[in-house]
A protein has these predicted regions:
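Short, Lys/Arg-enriched, Trp-marked, Pro/Gly-tolerant hinge/linker segments that flank
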Residues: 2-13, 17-50, 54, 58-65, ...
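Flexible coil/turn residues that form the inter-helical turn or adjacent wing/linker of helix-turn-helix
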Residues: 5, 54, 103-104, 115
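Basic/polar phosphate-binding segments, predominantly the helix-turn-helix DNA-binding elements
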Residues: 49, 54-91, 111-140
């Protein structure tokens, strides 16, 4: 069980690094200088990494940044190119895909681990993102 937990933690860290490299790739070869925006973005990304498995709300992220929900939603989309919920779900789906590859946990268990409490919703988003169900993804 200890080995499985270590593997799980490494999978999460690896998926996060891949996700951050994609984000950096979308914004050029490097992140902008340390500005208020980059500090806020770092705060939100750390919040997502720490809380992705919980029912993380836009209100929580806006509060972490010290701004209103409406301002946060506009700002986050400007910074990342996508809305907060879409970004959070992409992060969760990346982690789920990694867990499907490296563990034999059930799809239901993986969905719950990455923050989806509705299996049908998870399956629908996963299929939209990867073009196949989680079970099909695992068997490929």
């Amino acid at each position: 069980n200890k080995v499985k937990n270590t593997g799980y933690e490494l999978a999460i860290k690896g998926a996060l690094l891949r996700f951050l490299s994609i984000l950096i790739g979308q914004h050029g070869t490097s992140l902008p200088a340390d500005t208020t925006d980059t500090r806020r973005l770092k705060t939100v990304l750390q919040l997502i990494e720490a809380e992705y498995a919980t029912p993380l709300r836009i209100e929580d992220a806006a509060e972490a940044c010290g701004c209103s929900q409406s301002h946060f939603m506009r700002w986050f989309k400007k910074m990342t190119g996508q809305g907060f919920t879409a970004y959070l779900n992409d992060h969760r789906l990346n982690l789920a895909a990694e867990l499907l590859r490296i563990t034999d946990a059930t799809v239901l268990d993986i969905a719950g681990r990455v923050g989806f409490d509705n299996l049908s919703y998870f399956n629908r988003l996963f299929k939209r993102r990867y073009g196949m169900t989680p079970r099909e993804y695992r068997s490929k």
